[in-house]
Amino acid sequence: MADLTSPGISVSRREDGIGAEVSGVNLSLPLSSEAFAAINEGFERYRLLVFCKQDLSVKQQVEFSERFGRLEEFPDPKDQAEGYETVLRVSNIERESGNIKPVDDPGHKSFTLGTSSWHIDSSFRTLPSRASMLYGKEIPAAGGDTMFADTTRAYDAL
């Protein structure tokens, strides 16, 4: 059952207890103010939103992300997705050849070591980001999990 609704959009709490799933929206198309307001209200309430079955270009992801506020920049072009300095490309696929990097590849290994530990994106900044947006292009059937925690709920439980 939907907890929040807007014409055609439904925001429903996920059964696993964290976040909500948003349905009835195509993020590759421009969003009305009302539709974005429903999504933003869902974000404020649940802190984690899942949008299934989306097909976005990097440009479309940036346009949607900008609705939430100013985006962080990643100045090193090798880290950027298609030249967008506000999108960090995270991949085990080599950009030039399209080959999958071996697990022992120094660049891949240093990245996975740095991200495999629990962390909160941008927590080191004076003003941390409001959110992180992930868009998976090729998701493995098993493994490669990204985990989330509701730190507000954890703090309130202390």
PLM regions: where:
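Non-heme Fe(II) oxygenase catalytic core, chiefly the N-lobe of the double-stranded beta-helix
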Residues: 2-158
